[in-house]
Amino acid sequence: MSPSGRLCLLTIVGLILPTRGQTLKDTTSSSSADSTIMDIQVPTRAPDAVYTELQPTSPTPTWPADETPQPQTQTQQLEGTDGPLVTDPETHKSTKAAHPTDDTTTLSERPSPSTDVQTDPQTLKPSGFHEDDPFFYDEHTLRKRGLLVAAVLFITGIIILTSGKCRQLSRLCRNRCR
């Protein structure tokens, strides 16, 4: 089988396997910088729903035991919404005990990679009208397939470039030997 035939076969197999429910194991490396993330809630448009958004918090002052203030509620109005948005600081607890230097944003601890639960893409079923839509894909699947296609194209380009130079090199060697 020619190298281009092998490459085509590899491309087809690589694109078909993820659709059959066979996934590669993801290896993640964790560093001390990746141990915390910002707790972010992205608002989505739904009728008659209250939208919440996480806002950066100012440094928390240290109060004496007898002067502890009540938690304050931040209210914000977005364009195109009828009601106010309410963010309660009590719902997003900061991990200041674990990270005493992080004073400017509300942080939550990232679970360790060993406790992350990977679900099979075939078991995830979108809710609503997307169930029967053949053109609907979740973001994880799109990213995975996009990276796969990019990797195949990258390797194909390298093979094409190196095969052309190898031909020229072998031709050059033959001409010098004569």
From Swiss-Prot:
Residue ranges annotated as Extracellular topological domain: 22-145
Keyword flag Protein biosynthesis: no
Post-translational modifications: Glycosylated.
Protein topology in the membrane: Single-pass type I membrane protein
Transmembrane segments: 146-164
Keywords: Cell membrane, Glycoprotein, Ion transport, Membrane, Potassium, Potassium transport, Signal, Sodium, Sodium transport, Sodium/potassium transport, Transmembrane, Transmembrane helix, Transport
Any GO BP: negative regulation of calcium-dependent cell-cell adhesion
Segments of skewed composition (Polar residues): 103-125
GO molecular function, one term: actin binding
Region (Disordered) location: 23-131
Subunit record text: Regulatory subunit of the sodium/potassium-transporting ATPase which is composed of a catalytic alpha subunit, a non-catalytic beta subunit and an additional regulatory subunit. The regulatory subunit, a member of the FXYD protein family, modulates the enzymatic activity in a tissue- and isoform-specific way by changing affinities of the Na+/K+-ATPase toward Na(+), K(+) or ATP.
Family to which this protein belongs: Belongs to the FXYD family.
Protein name: FXYD domain-containing ion transport regulator 5
